[in-house]
Amino acid sequence: MTDGIYLNRPQHIYELRCVGFDEHLDYVVNKYPHFSGKTFFIGGNHMDTYFKNGGSDMGKAISREREDLIYLNPDTADLKIGKVGIHMHHGGGGRSYSLSYKLQRYVETLPQDKKIDIVMQGHFHNAMYMYYMGKHCFQVGALEDETPFSRSMGFKNEKSCYWVDIEVDDKGNIYSIEPTLEVFESKKLIRRR
């Protein structure tokens, strides 16, 4: 939802559209689109910087301001919609040689006795869908433009989101899934001086 505040990268402040917890909160609350549904979300390393640097939980603050944005947890959460089990995980570390590798390895660690139908993993700023080990798996894209930092690291942001239509039987088994990737226009790199 936000890029966070990286005190260990002094140039980071010059790459932001707005600066500080309050401005970031206002930006999300005012700019995140409104639509008829709810957005369930978790945090991650970017949003965790507010907690590390000042003890503030950006996810909780966003949910207090927008009742359609439901914050579940800082890093990992399980959600049930009807009988469909959804597992969200932010992820961590660097990118791998192939787009699916980190997601595949993570899915292999999930408990097999738990009903998880859909796995959604973030962090890597790439988008992809695959069916693996009986689970519909999504590598979700980024909600931010490419930054000078990501460019210097050789990371290409895929600014996007998935819209997912599913059909389930009475037991909650998915028999049809249609993921649609919406790609957003990226803006020009920002570096303020």
Predicted features along the sequence, with ranges:
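Short glycine/proline-enriched coil/turn segments at helix->beta-strand junctions
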Residues: P33-K38, V84, M133-G134
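Short, solvent-exposed aromatic-acidic interface loops
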Residues: S176-L189
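Core catalytic region of metal-dependent phosphoesterases/phosphodiesterases
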Residues: M1-Y71
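Short acidic-hydrophobic surface loop/beta-edge motif
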Residues: D75-G82, M130-Y132
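Residues that act as N-cap/strand-start positions at coil-to-secondary-structure junctions
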Residues: Y71-D75, E158
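Conserved beta-sheet core of the metallophosphoesterase superfamily
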Residues: G85-H87, G92-P179
